[in-house]
């Protein structure tokens, strides 16, 4: 996976935008002041007491139709009477953005929801990506029945190629998500060793003691799903990443009816997306961005238009293509991740491209500016993304012109503001018109949508997921407003073991979790010590001392020679280097006088003496590496 691909998906994973469209409009909340939340009464494993049950009606009326016969047969099996509590164990994704993975365990069955990666912090120098530590799954591999994936963003699928090497079980998800996973596995030469199982919205699969139903939701990528996880201890609903979009660009709106139907069954717990829990109101529909594109294309009819957006936002790409077609423009796509996702989505029918609309990037120069639209990666200022290379004049095929109109169809992710600002400045200096406001909506639910899902599902317990601690606590506050008791709301940390049934729920312990750092082909071979060394080198540089000693007497035969990298420029610091050599010689003479012959101790004496000297002279502490050779 390229750095461009990494940064692209990292930004999607951490999306939490402000602005006109993402903020939405708050609707009045008319619940009576004396309203008290009352979860529906259920017996110990989530079924209505016999005297309360209605006579069964047709399946289409009481629940979603299951498209496969096998699923219908299996999903109708009699629920197992609960003898144990359900364990929910988040192995990542809480108190952070990215690396989403949660284990659901009941007796001898474990089902894992999502398996995502995170991306390195600024101080993780040289690190390619970060994956969750799945030691718990490896220790209980005989129990693991499969991975169930909610959608195809990197923070939910990105760790699969690494984790499946140790925990090789089937992976279940919807059509587009499975296709994106297959692309990743192909890059790792794992297509023949991994079982990928495609499911449909409404289908129920059975994995050990669990039955799992996929529910249609809306998000910034197609085929996103919520999950209804049925266990003998009760039903848990996991929303995945979602928003409520009544007018989606492609496909159906979120299946709120099914959420309500499951809510009437009695839901033990709801695990709900917290990314936008700090924001009031509703998230605006993706379709609203299309009207903005229409206005911009009409305003800049004679200009070449370049639009930067997230690679996986297929609906956004569809609207750009639709607008370009209406205005008689050809569309070119640039950026590896953008090309991969668009190609896959088009092949599967999730992207509809009119004939003779799409052209190769090499053909852009053959058309007048007013007949071209370029869709590119780089909306977050990623240094190696296509737009950044254009801004820096190092792109091989596209040169920015003074009459270009460049649209950022995204908002800067927290932490990316400087990088985005740098690219905008570089583009503006070339005379381009840069538009970066009001051309984006979020893919995550705001407070009123969160309230809606809770009102439909009516869970006994609330478990905010997907977000930093402030996002989780923001959802906790929203849920308290709905009347769910504080003691029934669990803000968990990665590694917590939450045991629950219809009678009680409590955190009973922890499992080992953490981050595994991936550096090139190395997985887990870079730890805190290596990172500390890299940080030290980056901040203060290194000074290498080379000296040759006589084998028996430890008398200096050659040197000391001093090599500096990243500390000082030797030619301009000759006095400092001469002083450093003198300090090393004195330290070696001191060892000889004190009859210190152990090379390890000699290196320590040299290092301490040189470090003290350099600090006094420069107030800096480079890494010092003594090398002793014998002759």
PLM segments and residue spans:
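A glycine- and charged-residue-rich anion-binding loop/surface
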Residues: 94, 118-129, 143, 440, ...
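Conserved hydrophobic residues forming the short capping helix/wall of the S-adenosyl-L-methionine
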Residues: 185, 479, 614
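Short glycine-rich phosphate-binding loop at a beta-alpha junction
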Residues: 170, 463-464, 625-626
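Conserved beta-strand scaffold positions in the cores of enzyme catalytic domains, especially
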Residues: 88, 196-198, 269-271, 406, ...
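C-terminal tails and terminal domains of large nucleic-acid-associated
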Residues: 595-603, 607-631
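Hard-cation-handling environments
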Residues: 279-409, 413-595, 603
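Intrinsically disordered, low-complexity RNA-associated tracts
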Residues: 1-80
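His/Asp/Glu-rich metal-coordinating catalytic cores
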Residues: 56-146, 153-366, 385-399, 418-421
């Amino acid at each position: 996976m390229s750095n461009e691909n990494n940064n692209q998906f990292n930004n999607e994973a951490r999306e939490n935008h402000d602005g006109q469209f993402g903020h939405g409009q708050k609707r009045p909340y008319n619940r009576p002041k004396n309203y008290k939340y009352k979860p529906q009464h259920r017996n110990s494993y989530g079924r209505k007491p016999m005297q309360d049950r209605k006579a069964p009606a047709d399946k289409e009326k009481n629940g979603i139709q299951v498209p496969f016969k096998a699923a219908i047969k299996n999903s109708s099996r009699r629920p197992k009477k609960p003898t144990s509590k359900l364990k929910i164990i988040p192995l990542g994704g809480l108190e952070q953005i990215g690396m989403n993975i949660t284990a659901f365990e009941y007796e001898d069955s474990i089902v894992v929801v999502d398996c995502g990666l995170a991306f390195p912090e600024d101080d993780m120098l040289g690190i390619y990506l970060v994956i969750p530590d799945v030691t718990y799954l490896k220790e209980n591999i005989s129990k693991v029945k499969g991975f169930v994936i909610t959608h195809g963003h990197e923070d939910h699928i990105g760790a699969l190629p690494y984790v499946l090497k140790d925990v090789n079980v089937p992976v279940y998800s919807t059509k587009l998500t499975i296709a994106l996973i297959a692309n990743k596995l192909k890059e790792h030469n794992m297509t023949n060793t991994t079982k990928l199982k495609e499911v449909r919205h409404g289908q129920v699969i059975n994995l050990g003691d669990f039955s799992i139903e996929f529910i249609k939701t809306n998000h910034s990528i197609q085929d996103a799903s919520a999950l209804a996880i049925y266990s003998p201890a009760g039903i848990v609903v996991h929303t995945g990443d979602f928003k409520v979009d009544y007018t989606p660009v492609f496909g159906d709106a979120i299946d709120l009816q099914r959420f309500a139907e499951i809510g009437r069954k009695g839901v033990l717990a709801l695990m709900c997306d917290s990314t936008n829990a700090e924001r009031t109101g509703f998230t605006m529909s993706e379709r609203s961005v299309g009207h903005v594109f229409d206005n911009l294309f009409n305003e800049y009819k004679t200009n070449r238009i370049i639009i930067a957006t997230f690679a996986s936002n297929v609906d956004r790409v569809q609207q750009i293509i639709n607008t370009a077609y209406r205005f008689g423009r050809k569309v070119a796509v640039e950026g590896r991740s953008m090309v991969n996702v668009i190609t896959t989505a088009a092949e599967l029918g999730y992207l509809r491209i009119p004939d003779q609309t799409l052209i190769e990037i090499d053909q852009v120069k053959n058309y007048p500016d007013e007949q071209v639209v370029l869709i590119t990666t780089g909306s977050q200022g990623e240094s190696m993304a296509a737009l950044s290379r254009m801004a820096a004049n190092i792109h091989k095929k596209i040169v920015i012109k003074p009459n270009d109109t460049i649209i950022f169809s995204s908002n800067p992710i927290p932490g990316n503001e400087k990088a985005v600002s740098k690219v905008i400045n570089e583009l503006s200096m070339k005379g381009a018109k840069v538009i970066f406001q009001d051309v984006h909506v979020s893919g995550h639910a705001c407070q009123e949508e969160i309230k809606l899902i809770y009102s439909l599902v009516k869970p006994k317990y609330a478990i905010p997921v997907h977000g930093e601690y402030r996002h989780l606590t923001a959802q906790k506050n929203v849920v308290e407003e709905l009347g769910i008791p504080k003691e029934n709301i669990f803000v968990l940390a990665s590694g917590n073991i939450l045991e629950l049934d219809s009678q009680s729920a409590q955190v009973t312990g922890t499992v080992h979790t953490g981050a595994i750092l991936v550096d090139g082909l190395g997985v887990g071979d870079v730890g805190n010590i290596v990172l500390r060394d890299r940080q030290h080198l980056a901040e203060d540089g290194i000074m290498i001392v080379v000296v040759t000693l006589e084998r028996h007497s430890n008398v200096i035969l050659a040197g000391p020679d001093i090599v500096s990298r990243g500390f000082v420029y030797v030619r301009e610091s000759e006095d400092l280097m001469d002083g450093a050599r003198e300090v090393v010689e004195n330290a070696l003479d001191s060892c000889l006088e004190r009859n210190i012959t152990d090379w390890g101790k000699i290196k320590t004496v040299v290092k301490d003496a040189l470090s003290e000297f350099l600090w006094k002279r420069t107030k800096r502490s480079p890494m010092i590496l003594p090398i002793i050779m014998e002759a």
